[in-house]
């Protein structure tokens, strides 16, 4: 339990705020992804590449994550497992455009807004 508290909870607090967990503009069937274990991942901030990696770089493999989570929760078709991002943190400020790409899945574009603007 300590591991989960310390390893996963900070990411959940940062990346899963109410109304602020954008996932993808597309739903892609598994048949459209030839190798989910080696998809390119990229993040751009204002057009500048800030993160780059692949799903092969994940700390835990996709089959391991599915097996691990299945031990204590029921996974259903269509469920999403959030794993984090490639190395390279990037500060963003209101007005910045963040683009995230997953090879074969698509590209998600978001603009950062202030809390006051979001209300």
Model-predicted segments: where are they?
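Catalytic-core "active-site belt" of small-molecule-metabolizing enzymes
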Residues: 1-72, 88-119
